[in-house]
Amino acid sequence: MAKSHQARKTYRPLIALAAVLALGLVVRVVFLVQLERSELGDVLSLDSRLYYDVAHAISTGGALPPGALSFNPLYPVFLAATFRLFGEGLVAPRIVQLAAGLLTIVLIYLAGLRLVEGPRKGKLSGEATAIIAAATAVLYAQFVLYEGMILASAFEVLFLTASFVLALALDDELAGERPVRLGPRRVPPWGSGLLLGALCGAGALGRPNLFFLLIASLPVWLYLRNRKRRRAHVPALSFLVGAAIVLAPPVAYDAARTGRLVPITTHGGINFYVGNGPGSTGVFLPPADVRSGTSAFLEDARAKAEAETGRGMTEPEVSSYYVHKALSYIGANPGAWLALLGRKLLLFFGQDVSDMPSAFLYERSCSVLRLLLVPFAVIAPLGLCGLVVLFRSGRNRSVVSVFLACALASVLLFYVNVRYRLPAVPVLILTASLAVAWGAREISRKRFTRVAGLAAAAIAIFFLVSHRTFVPVSHSASYAFLGNYYLEHKDQARAADAFAEAYRLDPNRAEAIINYARILREQGRLREAADLYARAYAESPRFPLLAIEYGMVLSHIGRGNEARRLFLEATSASEARERALACRLLAQEALAEGNRGEALLWVKRALENVPGDPQLTAMLKQLESSR
C-alpha cells in the first residue's frame, strides 16, 4: 500500500504536466492552422522580411550585406537551415518554433520544481508551483503569437528559460543540496557553468542587450556563490569559456569587416538614443525624419548622423555617435532621464505596448488567441507579490534577482514593448505561480489575513501599473503595416483603406500622413494630397523622398515655383538616389520651360550621383544630340 501511494504521488504531477502539454499542443496546432488559412499568414513584418532575405542569401550561397552585421544573427542562421532542409516556406520554421514553445513550458515546469523546497512539512509544494506555472504559460497568448512569427522571440524565451533552470540547478549544487545530473551521472560545476555560458552566448545572438547583461552578471554571481570553496573561480571561468565559444564567430566576422571589435551587431546605438534621447516617451518613437522600418531606420539614422557630423561614417561609428549623443543628453538632463526611467519601469509592468506583430490584428483571424485568458496585467502584479514570498523563504533569491534585474535593465536601457519584455515573462510567471501556491496553502491553514494582505498588494499594483495609460496605444502602425503589405501584392483598394485607417487613428504621425497623402495622390485628389504633404513637410522636412513627392504634386497643380524650390532642396539629400531623382525632375522642369542647356546640366549632375544609370544616360545622349 505504501509503495502504491508513493507511486501515485510520483506520477500525479507528471500526469498533470502531460495534460497541460496536451492542451498546449492543441492550442498551437489550431493556431498554426488558423494562421496558415489567414491572409496574415504570409505577411512579414519589416524585421521578418529582413531576416527572410538574409536567410535566403545564406541558403543560396549569396553575399551578406556589406560591413558589420546590422542584424542579430541567430534567427537568420536558423531560418537558412530550415530553408536548406525543407525549402523556403514558412510552415517548417513555425512548426519548429511552436515545438520550442512546448519545450519552454516543460522548462518552466522544471524551474518551478527547483524554485521551492517542498514538499516537506511546513514548506510550499514545488509541484503545485510548477503545474500552475506551466498552465499559466499555456494560457499566455503572446507566447503562442510570437512562436508563429518569423522572429527570434520563441528562441529568446527558450534560451532564457533554459539558462534560468540551469542556474537554479547550479545554485542547488553549490549549496550542497541537489547535484546536477545527466541521467545517472553527476555533472561537475565546471560542466554546468560551461553549458550555462553557451546558452547565454546563443541567446546573445538573438537578443544581445539582455544576454550580454547576463554574461556580465552570472560569472560574478557564480564566484560569489562559490567563494568559500576551493577553486571557487572554476564555474565562473567555465561560464565565460562557454559564452566565448558561441560568440567568437560573429565577433570575428565583424572584426574582419570593420577592423574593430563590434559586439555582434551595430544597431544598438540608435536604439539607445531612441529610448533615452530628447523626446523619448519610453516606447519606440524614432526621430521625425527617420523611418520606422528596420532597414530604412538604419539607413536614415546613418544619413542623419553623417549630415550632423559632415563626414562619412561606418556602421560602428554611427552606433558610437548615437550612444555619445544620448549620454550627452542624459548628462545635461539627469532629472528628466530619471523620470523617464520611472515611466519605463511602470510601462514594463503595465500596459501592453504593441510591436509588430500585433495581437490586435491576429486575433481577428486566429480566434484561438482570444481563448488564452491570462494577460500580463494579471501575471505582473502576482509576480511582484511572489517575489516577496520568495525573498521571505530565503531560497533562490540571488538567482531570481540576477535574471529579473537583467531582463528589466535590458528593456529600461532602451524602450518598452511586448516583444522586448517577452523573455522576462517566464520568470514572472514562476513568481506569480509561487504567490498563488502560497495563497492556497495559507487559505488551507485558515490564515486569511495574510492572503488578504497579498491580494490587496496585487490589486494595488494592478491599479498602479496595469490600469493606467502611460502612453497612448494606437493601432495606426498596424494598419500602415497592412497597407504596405497590400501594396506589395498590388491590392490598391485595400491598401487605400488601411492607410486611411492608419491616418484616422494617428493623424499627427508623419508616416501616417505621408502614406495617406500618397493614396490621395493616386486617387487624383491632388489638392488634398498637397495639403497633407505640406503638414508632413512642416514637421519632418528631411523625411526621405518627402520633398520630391510634395514637389511633384505641387507641379501637377500648377505651383511650379514651389515645386522647383523643393526639388532644389532635395539635391542635397543624404541618399544618392534621392539627389539623382531631384536633379532629373529639375531637368524635366527646365525642358518644360524650353531651357535645354539647364536641363543638360541637371542630367549631368544626376549622373554624378548614380554613374551609369541607363535612363539618365539615354536622356543625356538625347539632349546632347539635339543641341
Specify the residue positions occupied by each region the protein language model found.
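Transmembrane-helix signature of polytopic, membrane-embedded enzymes
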Residues: I108-L139, V157-L158, V180-R185, G394-V402
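Extracytoplasmic catalytic/substrate-binding loops of multi-pass membrane glycan-assembly enzymes
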Residues: L35-Y52, L64-A81, G87-V91, L261-T265, ...
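Multi-pass, polyprenyl lipid-linked donor-dependent membrane glycosyltransferases
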Residues: S70, L74, P93-A100, I132-L170, ...
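Transmembrane-helix motifs of polytopic, lipid-linked glycan transferases
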Residues: I95-R120, A162, L166, P381-C385
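Membrane-proximal stem/loop segments at transmembrane-domain junctions that anchor or position
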Residues: P263-L347
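Membrane-interface transmembrane helices that cradle and orient dolichyl/undecaprenyl
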Residues: K3-H5, R120-L124, S163-L195, W221-R225, ...
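Membrane-interface anchor segments at the N-terminal boundary of transmembrane helices
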Residues: A92, Y322, S328-Y329, A336-V400
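Loop-to-helix entry region of an early transmembrane alpha helix in multi-pass inner-membrane enzymes
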Residues: P73-V77, G87-V106, I131-A134, Y146, ...
